Amino acid sequence: MEYYNEYLIQDEPNKCDKVRNWMAAIGLQDVDGLSPSKYMLETVRRNIEGEITIDEVERLVDEYYTTQEGLKQESRTLEADKVAVRIAKLLSHQTFGLGSNYLALIHRSLFEGIYKFAGTYRDYNISKKELVLRGESVRYEHAPLILPTLKYEFEQEDKFSYKDLTMEEMVKHISRFVANIWQVHPFGEGNTRTTAVFTIQYLKHLGFKVTNEIFADNSKYFRNALVRANYSNIQYGIKETTEYLERFFRNLLMDEKNELKNRYMIIGTSWNNETSTQENISSTQENISSTQEIQQSSRQTTTERIIDEIRKHPFTTREQLAKVIGITPDGIKKQLDKLKKAGKIRHVGSTKKGHWEIIE
């Protein structure tokens, strides 16, 4: 039959997929501490409702930042809005390429007009102090070796066969592969968001059923797990480990319920087995305050945690909040009612399809 020879044109994803794509797109901005504007959230709602297409969302957001109101927004809010739209667009596509060129294409697609170096490999070496490493840095790839290292990693992955592997073995391999790509850190900024988009698309390409909520809810954990997968200090008995990244992927691909806590990854704490390093690693005031910042987050009140979660994921549901916060849906409802009565939050739109806003 002739119609079998026709290619189907990729259309807008269904409502459920839209929500998941937007949750991941907005949640991944939290990796760099970015939050979307209220205008962006309202425009996203219209897309989810089917009122406008994702291309129209992109056009409206671009136009918003030429208005008087948009020009008052901070550059970080502009970045959060525009990159979130672009991530959602990429996640709605079924196209994929396993190679360094496609990785650069993702970066350029996300950050064109935001970073001058969008889609271009860095020509300088970098380091970054990490909270979970107490101020130490991962050793990122030497700039002249970025392209050959990426080519090697992608060639090895292309040759690799997942046939006859158990899910545990697949998760271990995927964790190491993704960690290796991230360690190269080929771009000046935006590496984790680029890696996350690439990873989601690759897993779908392999045939895995991927729900993006785990990336949305645990974007900082994802980055810190990548950090721990690429840091070692033999003097203090610290070895690079994909253990934490495997927990993330086991939740994603095997529907496990591993607890994903950033504090577990801090080197030299009682949360992990490297307690012997606690006395050996020098603790500058900066490192101490950084660790206290992570530990303080675990002592937040329930309402503070709910507000933080809503700020990161405005389209979250009561059920999702209950799961993240660790209390019953009824308990979440009571807390939300208290916050609404106190004038701290409001719900915009219908019960099932609306979003939360924080009243500053």
Model-derived segments and their meaning:
Residues 1-360:
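FIC/Doc superfamily catalytic core
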